[in-house]
């Protein structure tokens, strides 16, 4: 059976108070479905924090991926149901057993992938809230009985906040996060920070190789940072691409103080990011993790629009060639094309120059 992990939960059957939106009266038993990936889970966590800030007695259940759970597992007052997509039909059956006999006041369908849509059928809810028509893909609309308000050219995080809007949760001026780690991991991070001194994190690997910057340019940037008096460390996950990317950078013999690739848990990585002066990364999870702990990020982009997927609080600090790549490939500016359209090509990141990155570094440090 799927492991069901509980945070400390406040139980309540009372109803939400009235709000001035069109759906002013709903119940407080809420389930959200966002399985992956790390960056998107960071965005979803901001929405959860918003709900908890204004409705602290809400009963929240989060259906989440096995790996992603490791990042948010200590969030208070949330019941997590782990959905291991590698189990296929068995994962759906386990989810069904985990929510057996329950009816939620609202199910927030925050993932449009068909796998998530199909799995959502076993969750009983009075309101099944999905994305608006423009953002509905893979038959997403078939599984919802209500849609969030339409929105143009929004960041993924703002799109997730639309679900809180649909519930009537009061808006926030800026998002915030509450993603705790253990005292042991906090101490570990403090020890590493003390040993490293003033350091910058390079998280070089995205989930696809085409989104990665050139190893020699990462190496050149590490040397540039070292000349500015900064220690530089590499971080990444245990996957082959992460390790291969780190090794390619190290082969260039840059000034790297430590390589943490594949050597940290997600919580240890989060603490390393928290104590850093700056993070340099392509479109990858650690960039968004750094945002949750208020560390400045320089994002490197070519394939996706940083206005949509960039580090939320550091969009202006991205170095992006997305605009020119899209216009060259499509013959139109991205504003004239469907929102979220990606540029294609294995070598697009070659357009991101070290001079442009150095300029951002100088502005931030």
Locations of regions flagged by a protein language model:
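Catalytic machinery of carbohydrate-active enzymes
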Residues: 1-365
